[in-house]
């Protein structure tokens, strides 16, 4: 493509699309030279944008590589490590969900790293959706499990929290040699298990588990919002926002509400 014959606005759109797609076939050094040699100031500045993009991508690869290396130090080459995390411990409605993910930790080429992984709460909805698909495609194995609000009411959130993590690990298609869980150890787990404080920001495997668990649960709550629109589950995901609590007081609870969590809100239970 001859950038010199393009309008500045078209060049800007072209560069934007390249950076979004992270096209591996692009010779970025040649592209930067072409932009910097252009007589138009706006086009020259796009060269700076590409340089900044490459610098940020390098930093991101280093950050994520460190997350992979964090996991690798726990196991020997050729063995499996699973990262496990849960989402939905605190909401007033909906299930608690956990995921376990086994990654290929022997990746040599940085191009194959799953970039942008992190604590799922620090990632936008759109990026989480995109990453969830990538994680599922590239994972050696993954498992997503849920425990309903009814079972939470019956057995308590502490038991369910541990149980859903245990189920996620036990339903993997490969047998991990070690499980890393976020925050605390999984009790009564037959597989060797260690916990990592703030693990979803340190461990690649835990971060990936955090992301796919949250995406699964968020999409489930969005579907529930179609059945129960008064509660705005598509916005609060079942958490106790002011609007959600007001809706409970006005309309009562649904089948997916955790009645054991509502004793201080309603006097019905």
Swiss-Prot record:
Q: Where in the cell is it found?
A: Cytoplasm
User: What general EC class does the enzyme of this chain belong to?
Assistant: hydrolase
Q: Which Pfam family is one of this chain's hits?
A: RNase_HII
CDD domains registered for this protein in UniProt = RNase_HII_bacteria_HII_like (cd07182)
Q: Which residues belong to any copy of the RNase H type-2 domain?
A: 79-269
Give the protein's cofactors.
Mn(2+); Mg(2+)
The entry's free-text remark on the cofactor is: Manganese or magnesium. Binds 1 divalent metal ion per monomer in the absence of substrate. May bind a second metal ion after substrate binding.
Where does this protein chiefly localize? cytoplasm
**What does it catalyze?**
Endonucleolytic cleavage to 5'-phosphomonoester
> Which residues of the sequence carry a binding annotation for a divalent metal cation?
85-86, 182
Q: Which family does it belong to?
A: Belongs to the RNase HII family.
Q: Summarize the protein's role.
A: Endonuclease that specifically degrades the RNA of RNA-DNA hybrids.
Q: What is this protein called?
A: Ribonuclease HII
- Organism, by scientific name, is Clostridium novyi (strain NT)
Encoding gene, per UniProt annotation: rnhB
